């Protein structure tokens, strides 16, 4: 178990994971500052998985899934939660051993606990991504997803990126032995204990109310369309009209375009929470996002290729 950090707090567990993966050679980057549904959507994973350039990153990512909100009344369902993401390319042969080492560091002796890798291949339709994967079950509870990326944005991942995604709240609930996420000890210092509920319960209540009851449907449809238009403009797929003139970007800008796509995707997720999209419409919207993501993947790969894939040097 980590001696540096109190892993029986949510804060200490995160610090211990960051320290452990930094010691394995990962660069610890910061959370992406936009609404995403999972740590995979962080550009350090979604885009850096493309092309031959090696990488090793780890980070915490706040994730939003509006339809999962329960007004703060469910002990383990949240519309806003945290993942810890590790991505290494090319995936090292011993990545599973490294992961088991992180569990041991958190106090789980593999000889004393039932740790199982259950096959569960992963797919993200909006990212046009899929991979071979496993859920990791710790004493009967899923705590981690392992994925070996095969495609992102419809492009083949060569070499393969290994991804490890920890469900931080679930892992912490197991370590602390609590049945409600809101009872987790977030920190315990000179000023006393702070619980997860102290920090986030009101946000869950209010954001659930907004997501399900008050998010402006007409505004969100308009947002989706505008973000889609802006992404296409930034990818040189269509012009923008300014003062009755067509304006084109000189060179595709995949990183800003990707941010517009994430905004469109979050607008879509809010519309989904408001039940404003039918089943058939839902598929059409997913395909629209997927088409944009494919454009970003191709433009990003081309931009790195034009630079001579500098990370390979």
From Swiss-Prot:
Compartments reported by the entry: Cytoplasm
Alphabetical UniProt keywords: Aminoacyl-tRNA synthetase, ATP-binding, Cytoplasm, Ligase, Nucleotide-binding, Protein biosynthesis
Matches recorded under SUPFAM superfamilies: Class II aaRS and biotin synthetases
An example Gene Ontology molecular-function term: ATP binding
Subunit field text: Tetramer of two alpha and two beta subunits.
HAMAP family: Gly_tRNA_synth_alpha
PANTHER family in the record: GLYCINE--TRNA LIGASE, CHLOROPLASTIC_MITOCHONDRIAL 2, GLYCYL-TRNA SYNTHETASE
Name assigned to this protein: Glycine--tRNA ligase alpha subunit
Organism encoding this protein: Mannheimia succiniciproducens (strain KCTC 0769BP / MBEL55E)
